[in-house]
């Protein structure tokens, strides 16, 4: 069970054992098929995945704060909230490389003193962090999305250096900075 379940809005069924997740999904899919298909069809059921955790190969994390005017956070949106962010340092749907990159980026962002982009005020720098890891090659691509309003080359240089120093299972294939 994911330790962030309940607060984090990223997953729906992480509070259930995998077998219960499968049963629920199978019931939902079977119901949709029954309603969508006219006539008889062969139902083969839902096949379990051999990978039950750390199965995501791409994630987009958001910058924000965990509560109004709180410290900068980097993670997923809180359940039911478009503004508040949950730091997901122990997210179960990504592997350890994602967590290391997430922690490194959050630490560098906090040390920089730069602010997250505040949607209501239209101020700040940090928007999103995208991480992608190829399943077969384990090549990792990281993309930091920021605003264009701040010249933060010193932060970017420090952040890239820290990322390249991480001990990862995968191989860092690219580090991007997207201004948006």
Where are the model-predicted features located?
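Accessory RNA-recognition modules of RNA-modification enzymes
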Residues: 1-180
């Amino acid at each position: 069970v994911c330790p962030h379940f309940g607060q984090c809005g990223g997953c729906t069924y992480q509070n259930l054992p995998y077998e219960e997740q499968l049963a629920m999904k199978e019931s939902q899919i079977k119901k949709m098929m029954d309603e969508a298909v006219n006539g008889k069809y062969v139902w083969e059921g839902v096949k379990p995945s051999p990978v039950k955790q750390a199965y995501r190969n791409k994630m987009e994390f958001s910058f924000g704060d965990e509560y109004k005017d709180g410290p900068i956070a980097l993670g997923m949106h809180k359940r039911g909230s478009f503004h508040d962010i949950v730091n997901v340092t122990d997210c179960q749907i990504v592997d350890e490389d994602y967590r290391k990159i997430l922690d490194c980026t959050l630490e560098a962002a906090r040390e920089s003193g730069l602010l997250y982009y505040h949607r209501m005020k239209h101020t700040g720098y940090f928007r999103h962090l995208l991480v992608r890891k190829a399943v077969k090659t384990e090549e990792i691509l990281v993309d930091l999305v920021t605003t264009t309003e701040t010249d933060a080359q010193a932060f970017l240089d420090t952040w890239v250096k820290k990322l390249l120093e991480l001990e990862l299972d995968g191989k860092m294939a690219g580090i991007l900075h997207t201004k948006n």
